[in-house]
Swiss-Prot record:
PANTHER family: TUMOR NECROSIS FACTOR FAMILY MEMBER, TUMOR NECROSIS FACTOR LIGAND SUPERFAMILY MEMBER 15. Belongs to the tumor necrosis factor family. InterPro entries: TNF, TNF_dom, Tumour_necrosis_fac-like_dom. It is a single-pass type II membrane protein. The lineage of its organism: Eukaryota, Metazoa, Chordata, Craniata, Vertebrata. The gene is Tnfsf15. The record marks 188, 191 as: Important for binding TNFRSF6B. The chain crosses the membrane at residues 40-60. Homotrimer. Residues 96-252 form the THD domain. This is Tumor necrosis factor ligand superfamily member 15.
Amino acid sequence: MAEELGLGFGEGVPVEVLPEGCRHRPEARAGLAARSKACLALTCCLLSFPILAGLSTLLMAGQLRVPGKDCMLRAITEERSEPSPQQVYSPPRGKPRAHLTIKKQTPAPHLKNQLSALHWEHDLGMAFTKNGMKYINKSLVIPESGDYFIYSQITFRGTTSVCGDISRGRRPNKPDSITVVITKVADSYPEPARLLTGSKSVCEISNNWFQSLYLGAMFSLEEGDRLMVNVSDISLVDYTKEDKTFFGAFLL
């Protein structure tokens, strides 16, 4: 029987041979069919296991990739939302500047053709010094080289008696004009340099009078230069209000 089922192939396929007496029984054929179905089912299970395992692996890999993608997208979004260093706003560097207001002056003998330096308030009321600018010994000290705008307004006040004495030729230590000079003192120059000068006749007004002189211009200054304001007569300077007499400078 086995040789007959070889059907010419190189080797015969093993086939279960029923005993001679049971070859034609229906029960035997049914058992053989059931056994064949069981083998087929087992084979299908064995073949499907790798497929199911592969699908499970792919599914798990897909589930693991999702959080990674979310993290990547979140990182990219956060990176885009954060401004780059070039886009971060940085406030401009503070430039040196100062505004000084007049304070009551100490009386001093007035000498002809001699200009006296004024004292200033530097940290009260409207007065201030910022970003390196300093006020030392009647002078503004320049902290860094550059182009500065320098300004000053000096208000003088007088009476008719003074003007009357001057007009009649009597000069009781009183000038016939008022003069303001902004002076620069530098270590590189042996003498103070006059930057701005303003003058006004005192007796052009017949009554009690107030007269203001304003000076302002741009100058190139060096670090360490000192600026001061000199006047022809300190006793005529109006120190009653800080908006009448002031002095300042700032870097452009």
